[in-house]
């Protein structure tokens, strides 16, 4: 009878001596579908014929079978038969196509399985250790980034504090310079009495001691600032903050604050002392002015009694005519001066326009350089993206090869994992390099914006100072011209009065009769003298105001010079920082040359960027040199103005002396008033002639006023044209700045896009890693399932061995089984 396959779990009953089993197996003792089938038939009609058995009554025996994977179909195979008269054994062996080799006892050994398990465990341990190492490295990188960020923030805070302290020191130094100037002024005033001199010496000693204390405090504060700068520079080079560094920084900060507080206290005391001295000096000056005024009033009263009325009337008429002629001359001079000033203004505006055009061209060149750098950054990012794509493709290829290698052999899995780790390391290095490049770009951009702002502020300050200097120069010229006119008028008066002196002697007898009306004229002349004195006082006040304005301009020029010195210091600091950063970058690039041999183009681009930055620094140095030259010119102009003011003082003193001489001559003329009465008739005729001349002069004045109006209109039109040109240049500069800002925004958007693309690439890389890990876990699960099936098949083989031993317990059956069975080489010895 033929063996039949069953889908359920087979069962074996207790077998006796005549029990027979049939077995179907594959390479690893598997049936094609389900459990092996064994049938035993018995008959009492036939006898034994050799080794064959024919049994009518059949019994189906089922055995327990391990779990088999689904997806395979059952099939019937041709079996082998051994017949005997009472029994028949039928075995269905597997087909030759499916069974490649014959099963042996060596195949049933578990050494290969144990070695495979050991290898799998080793691989699992290696994978776990590598994953742990990667996680540790990531955590360390995150910690280092956090520490660097904290250190950067700390350094930035310290820098801000240092800048504030430096600003305060600059203010205190400016105050010290003001105090020194005040002390020098105090030294120059030596017209005090002995008691006042002693008191002043004591006050000077106090002030000098306080100044020395303030300078000592300032020097100590400057030393503390330098120490803080040195510590911060060391921290920049070390890039790691320790507890000792933090303690030293806090100590130095406390010392600096203490010394600054002492410095402020000394400054306050100095200010109080100087205020007291100024108050005393003002009170003394007021007392002196009161005394001089009283003396002048007494002199005026004496002059009132001496002067006569007729002489004052004649002087009035003559002076009015002279004033009208002088007004005409002054108007002509003002018209010529206005034309000259308009020409100078045109030249100045043209020079300013040329300067602005040159600045616009420079800005255009800078914007072009920025565009080039942006394009270079784009090329770098594109190259990095291409490299990332190539690495992705390589990773995909490597993953496919890894899949094939895992199916074929397990040793290729190690190589693929190592290669994947190398790729992860390379990707991390490239991400770090991209982040560093972006950070350097942002730092350069911020520094460029700061330098542009500082440059604009300095240019505006220089323009304001130039305008003030021109205004002061114009005012000084007008003052000088007025003084010259006054002096010329006084000289002309002297000549005329000397000429009239001889005539007054003859007229003295005639004027005795008309003495009463002449007294009225004398009073009027006295009033005119008072007016002249008031005008002299006004001129003195104007000169004092101009002196104060010149001092203000000098102080402003000193402030601009201090600001330029600060700019020079900041540029030097930027140079030092740039050199340090360049050296650090060179060291980093030299250390990374072994790892970055595949990226020489990027290094060349970075070197080109460094060269461009150095060129920009050289340009900024040239600009600073130009600004220093401009400041030196301004200082020379201010000194020239001071010389002019001194000349004006001397002229004013000379005019005062001349006024004294005139007063003496007026006294002499008072004595000679008696001789002027005879010349009244002649003067009346002369007055009629002069009235006609005055009428003609008025006509000329009207014509000149018309000409002045036309000139004023031309001036207004020229000024409006200049303003329009300036507004046009401003609009052009604003449009260029807007275009530059739009380009910068475009570059920033491109950078953000590259950042998002890098984030997407990182996400895809993480997804690929997760998929790879999930596939590895699936393979592990499959290996475990195969191991479980191997164990179950081994148990099944042992069970079959035991069943064969029980079935073929008799000698003839066992011998016949051993001689004719194809599994005899696999059966255990009896």
Swiss-Prot record:
Molecular function, one GO term: structural constituent of cytoskeleton
Expression sites by tissue: Testis-specific (at protein level). Expressed in spermatids at tubular stage V of the spermatogenic cycle. Highly expressed in the cytoplasm of elongating spermatids (tubular stages X/XI). In step 14/15 spermatids of tubular stage III/IV low expression detected. No expression detected in other testicular cells as well as the early round of spermatids.
Keyword Transmembrane helix assigned: no
Its job: Seems to be a major component of sperm tail outer dense fibers (ODF). ODFs are filamentous structures located on the outside of the axoneme in the midpiece and principal piece of the mammalian sperm tail and may help to maintain the passive elastic structures and elastic recoil of the sperm tail. May have a modulating influence on sperm motility. Functions as a general scaffold protein that is specifically localized at the distal/subdistal appendages of mother centrioles. Component of the centrosome matrix required for the localization of PLK1 and NIN to the centrosomes.
Domain of life assignment: Eukaryota
Protein's UniProt keywords contain rRNA processing: no
Subcellular location: Cytoplasm, Cytoskeleton, Microtubule organizing center, Centrosome; Cell projection, Cilium; Cytoplasm, Cytoskeleton, Microtubule organizing center, Centrosome, Centriole; Cytoplasm, Cytoskeleton, Spindle pole
Family: Belongs to the ODF2 family.
Post-translational modification: Tyrosine phosphorylated. Phosphorylated on Ser-95 by TSSK4.
Residues with the Phosphothreonine modification: 92, 110, 231
Coiled-coil annotated residue ranges, if any: 144-217, 245-423, 461-798
Keyword field: Cell projection, Cilium, Coiled coil, Cytoplasm, Cytoskeleton, Developmental protein, Differentiation, Flagellum, Isopeptide bond, Microtubule, Phosphoprotein, Spermatogenesis, Ubl conjugation
Gene Ontology biological-process annotations: cell differentiation; spermatogenesis
Subunit structure: Self-associates. Associates with microtubules and forms a fibrillar structure partially linked to the microtubule network. Interacts via its C-terminus with PLK1. Interacts with ODF1. Interacts with MARK4; the interaction is required for localization of ODF2 to centrioles. Interacts with TSSK4. Interacts with AKNA. Interacts with CFAP58. Interacts with BBOF1. Interacts with CCDC38. Interacts with CCDC42.
Main location: cytoplasm
Phenotypic consequence of gene deletion: Null mutations in F9 embryonic carcinoma cells eliminated distal/subdistal appendages and prevented primary cilium formation. Loss of ODF2 also disrupted two mother centriole-specific NIN dots, while leaving one dot on the proximal end of mother and daughter centrioles.
Protein name: Outer dense fiber protein 2
């Amino acid at each position: 009878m033929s063996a039949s396959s069953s889908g359920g779990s087979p069962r074996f009953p207790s077998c006796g001596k005549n029990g027979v089993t049939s077995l179907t197996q594959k390479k690893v003792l598997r049936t094609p579908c389900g459990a092996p089938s064994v049938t035993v038939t018995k008959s009492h009609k036939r006898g034994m014929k050799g080794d064959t058995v024919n049994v009518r009554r059949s019994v189906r025996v089922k055995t327990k079978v391990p779990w088999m994977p689904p997806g395979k179909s059952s099939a019937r195979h041709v079996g082998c038969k051994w017949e005997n008269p009472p029994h028949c054994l039928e075995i269905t062996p597997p087909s030759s196509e499916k069974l490649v080799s014959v099963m042996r006892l060596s195949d049933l050994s578990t050494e290969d399985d144990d070695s495979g398990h050991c290898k799998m465990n080793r691989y699992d341990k290696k994978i776990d250790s590598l994953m742990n190492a990667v996680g540790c490295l990531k955590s360390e990188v995150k910690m280092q980034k956090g520490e660097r960020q904290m250190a950067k923030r700390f350094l930035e805070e310290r820098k801000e504090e240092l800048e504030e302290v430096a600003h305060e020191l600059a203010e205190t130094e400016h105050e010290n310079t003001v105090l020194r100037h005040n002390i020098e002024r105090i030294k120059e005033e030596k017209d005090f009495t002995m008691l006042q001199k002693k008191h002043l010496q004591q006050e000077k000693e106090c002030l000098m001691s306080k100044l020395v204390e303030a300078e000592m405090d300032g020097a100590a504060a400057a030393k503390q600032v330098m120490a803080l700068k040195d510590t911060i520079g060391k921290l920049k080079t070390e890039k790691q903050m320790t507890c000792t560094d933090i303690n030293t920084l806090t100590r130095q900060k406390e010392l600096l604050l203490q010394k600054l507080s002492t410095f402020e206290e000394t400054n306050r005391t100095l200010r109080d002392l100087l205020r007291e001295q100024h108050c005393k000096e003002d009170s003394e000056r007021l007392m002196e002015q009161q005394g001089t005024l009283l003396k002048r009033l007494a002199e005026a009263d004496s002059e009132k009694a001496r002067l006569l009325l007729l002489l004052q009337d004649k002087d009035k008429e003559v002076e009015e005519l002279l004033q009208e002629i002088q007004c005409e001359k002054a108007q002509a001079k003002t018209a010529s001066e206005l034309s000259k000033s308009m020409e100078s203004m045109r030249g100045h505006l043209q020079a300013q326009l040329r300067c602005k055009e040159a600045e616009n061209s420079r800005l255009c060149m800078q914007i072009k350089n920025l565009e080039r750098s942006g394009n270079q950054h784009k090329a770098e990012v594109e190259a990095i993206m291409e490299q990332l794509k190539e690495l992705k493709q390589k990773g995909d290829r490597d993953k496919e090869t890894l899949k094939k290698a895992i199916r074929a052999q397990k040793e290729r899995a190690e190589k693929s994992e190592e290669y994947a780790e190398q790729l992860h390391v390379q990707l991390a290095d490239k991400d770090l390099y991209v982040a560093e490049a972006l950070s350097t770009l942002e730092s350069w951009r911020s520094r460029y914006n700061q330098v542009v702002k500082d440059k604009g502020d300095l240019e505006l300050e220089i323009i304001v100072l130039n305008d003030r200097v021109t205004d002061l120069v114009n005012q000084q010229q007008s003052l000088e011209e007025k003084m010259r006119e006054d002096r010329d008028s006084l000289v002309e008066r002297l000549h005329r009065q000397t000429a009239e002196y001889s005539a007054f002697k003859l007229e003295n007898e005639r004027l005795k009769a008309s003495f009463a009306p002449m007294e009225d004229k004398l009073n009027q002349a006295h009033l005119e003298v008072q007016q002249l004195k008031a005008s002299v006082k006004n001129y003195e006040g104007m000169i004092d105001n101009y002196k104060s304005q010149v001092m203000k301009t000098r102080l402003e020029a000193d402030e601009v010079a201090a600001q330029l010195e600060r700019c020079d210091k900041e540029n030097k600091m930027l140079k030092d920082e740039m050199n340090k950063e360049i050296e650090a970058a060179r060291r980093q690039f030299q250390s990374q040359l072994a790892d970055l041999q595949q990226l020489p183009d990027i290094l060349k681009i970075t070197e080109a960027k460094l060269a461009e930055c150095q060129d920009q620094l050289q340009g900024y140095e040239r600009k600073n040199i130009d600004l220093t030259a401009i400041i030196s010119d301004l200082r020379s102009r201010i000194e020239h103005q001071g010389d002019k003011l001194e000349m004006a003082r001397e002229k004013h003193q000379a005019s005062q002396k001349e006024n004294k001489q005139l007063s003496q001559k007026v006294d002499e003329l008072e004595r000679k008033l008696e001789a002027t009465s005879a010349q009244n008739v002649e003067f009346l005729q002369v007055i009629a002639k002069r009235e006609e001349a005055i009428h003609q002069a008025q006509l000329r004045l009207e014509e000149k006023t018309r000409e002045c109006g036309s000139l004023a209109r031309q001036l207004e039109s020229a000024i409006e044209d200049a303003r329009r040109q300036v507004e046009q240049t401003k609009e052009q500069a604003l449009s260029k700045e807007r275009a530059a800002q739009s380009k910068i925004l475009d570059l920033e958007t491109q950078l953000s896009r590259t950042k998002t693309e890098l984030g997407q690439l990182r996400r895809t890389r993480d997804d690929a890693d997760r998929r790879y890990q999930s596939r590895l876990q699936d393979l592990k699960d499959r290996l475990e399932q195969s191991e479980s099936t191997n164990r179950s098949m081994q148990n099944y083989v042992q069970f079959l061995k035991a069943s064969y031993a029980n079935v073929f317990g008799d000698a003839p059956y066992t011998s016949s089984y051993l001689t004719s069975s194809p599994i005899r080489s696999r059966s255990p010895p009896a």
